[in-house]
Amino acid sequence: MDTILTNSKARHEYHIEETFEAGIVLSGTEVKSLRAGKGQIRDAFARVEDNEIWLYNAHIEEYSHGNTANHQPKAKRKLLLHKREISKLFGVAAIKGKALVPLSFYWKSGKVKVQLAVGRGKDAADKRQTIKKRDSDRELRQTMMRRR
């Protein structure tokens, strides 16, 4: 599993409850641009529409060697999941305070996959608590390394 893009903001903004692996419908120039590592999914989110899941605000830069048939950088893109997963996500997405956020894009058997997560939004106190825990864990690891 070779990671292409990661959403560093997702784990800071949301409590991740469940993850899914989804395929994504891309054009040739989008795949070439992703191979070059040109994109970001920091502001991306997914929505269920007509029993299909669509990814919004995923920015994949235009391919540098592309011609006039190049893709739109912020176009909505269809995610490919099984029907039972879509129906499960449809129920979850309807709950207030829950969101479908992409955690990463990665290669699997030559195809681009999306790690999609169900997240519940954090408030400011939760974010501060997460930062404190991360800092204390880092200090603990450093003291353990010094004692060796």
Which residues are covered by each model-predicted region?
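RNA pseudouridine synthases
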Residues: D2-T3, A117, D126
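Compact, glycine-rich, soluble single-domain proteins
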Residues: D50, A58-A93
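A positional/architectural concept
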Residues: D2-V48, E52
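C-terminal end-helix/capping segment
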Residues: K74, L81-S87, R120-R148
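Beta-rich strand-turn-strand
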Residues: L80-A117, G121-D123
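Residue-level signature for short turns and capping positions that connect secondary-structure elements
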Residues: E21, V31, A46, I60-E61, ...
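Flexible glycine-/small-residue-rich
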Residues: G28, V48-D50, N57, L116-R120
